[in-house]
Amino acid sequence: MELKGSKTEQNLWTAFAGESQARNKYTYFASKAKKEGYEQIAAIFEETANNEKEHAKMWFKELNGGEIPSTVENLEAAADGENYEWTDMYDEFAKVAEEEGFKALAAKFRGVAAIEKEHEERYRKLLENVKGDLVFSKDGDKVWICRNCGHVCIGKSAPKVCPVCAHPQAYFEVKADNYM
């Protein structure tokens, strides 16, 4: 049987969207419960949010042949999704909001569209890095930091294994000092 184009595929997308939305809502509810002094209720919302995340993951995997796609595929999909959001979706939402007199919401839609454009650019650059084998190697010396223990080193490539905590190269990134 072919899942693509079936009512079951539509149901999987609906289930994925519903579980994803529930997860976010319950996370927001947990935050509010904490602020209002209800730690137990917050913990139950958080637990349920994590359950919903796993339900969404299960449906997402079914939609993708039983597994999460590769990082390259995910970066491509993410970039394409962000492109749609900033070029079509939020642009249309802003126009409608403006026509209906919701000027402040139109401005928010446009503001988020600008952020989505940045997201697309970031994903496309990361995709270039993966395809060009430039995630852990760069032209010229860079300052690398281990995301696990904070070890810092300088070189064209991150170490294969952190000499301090023994975590693999996957834990390294180019150090960014954005607080200076």
Model region roles, listed by residue range:
Residues M1-M180:
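Non-heme di-metal
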